[in-house]
């Protein structure tokens, strides 16, 4: 195994940060390839808890190279706030440990402003954006009007690009939405300061990452969000603005598909999502409330309560197919301890037909009735399991169902938030 992917197999919040931290122990390089500081990863090391948004989870190891790829949209203000936060917890961050793609696009103040304005303008049709400027930054990237990191650190290029872009953005903000114009000098001076601080970290990451792979180093690609939030294969428009699936690695980190050897899908033992959109297995009762409280299902980035539901194997099967997953890592199976009976969705009934895939149409997905199979539960002793044989028999049956239905093995099981509560039960 030389280069492998860790990505979310549901609607995000599956425990990718913890799994990346666990797998990073044997990696040499950890690469973020998409998204921005809208992501939220929580990693527990000993008695310390770290909340990461932009910087790869490998930063918690002293001997790893961490990479922010060109597919990421970078908010310099958020980056340096996160660096200061980590350094306050004793994590050293230097250009030897963190590098940033010169091709990554930069989130500007007008992106955050427009994100909020447009979301409010949607009224009850809002899509649940985090308001961090992610979508507008990706929009500028596709419209070829964005500012990249390599532009930002070249003063003359940045000056010219900012003048041209801000003139257009201010017209949109003031004339269309009735907002206040942004001040050029204020933005220019603020971002010049960021440019100087960024400069030592900026590299052509594609060259470096490919050389690491060629030299036989272990490279881990860390995804953000989840498969059902992918811009193409997610529950559009209630999605993020980037490609969250395995194919996004090639574009977002500048590596070829033949370089990737394995892809691990991270899946909770139940299902959650934040914000609006269809959710076939959602629990709108006391069981859903119980799972939310026991699983601490509140967003790291937004603090919003997550919607909770039964495990949806249709979603996992779809994720395995789209990303060519070689295995699953199942997290938070301990959260379900104490329930006498569990349900697992094994298909949807749509217009009288049974299907085992996620339909593209939101209207169709909203009409899907979940078909359930019931399983007997297990008790809280599962949190003490440290190997596969320690797991309760009913939990093993539950995991076996995931494998059989998705035709994808379960390689890792997590029974709690700490590093030592993770067990590898087969090769990934």
From Swiss-Prot:
It is an enzyme of class 6 (ligase). One of its GO terms (biological process) is 'de novo' AMP biosynthetic process. The active site is at residues 13, 41. Its cofactor is Mg(2+). Pfam families: Adenylsucc_synt. It catalyses: IMP + L-aspartate + GTP = N(6)-(1,2-dicarboxyethyl)-AMP + GDP + phosphate + 2 H(+). Substrate binds at residues 300-306. GO terms for molecular function: adenylosuccinate synthase activity; GTP binding; magnesium ion binding. Binds 1 Mg(2+) ion per subunit. It is found in: Cytoplasm. Pathway: Purine metabolism; AMP biosynthesis via de novo pathway; AMP from IMP: step 1/2. Keywords: Cytoplasm, GTP-binding, Ligase, Magnesium, Metal-binding, Nucleotide-binding, Purine biosynthesis. InterPro entries: Adenylosuccin_syn_GTP-bd, Adenylosuccin_syn_Lys_AS, Adenylosuccinate_synth_dom1, Adenylosuccinate_synth_dom2, Adenylosuccinate_synth_dom3, Adenylosuccinate_synthetase, P-loop_NTPase. GTP binds at residues 12-18, 40-42, 306, 332-334, 414-416. IMP binds at residues 13-16, 38-41, 130, 144, 225, 240, 304. GO terms for cellular component: cytoplasm. Mg(2+) binds at residues 13, 40. Homodimer. Plays an important role in the de novo pathway of purine nucleotide biosynthesis. Catalyzes the first committed step in the biosynthesis of AMP from IMP. Belongs to the adenylosuccinate synthetase family. This is Adenylosuccinate synthetase. The lineage of its organism: Bacteria, Bacillati, Bacillota, Clostridia, Eubacteriales.
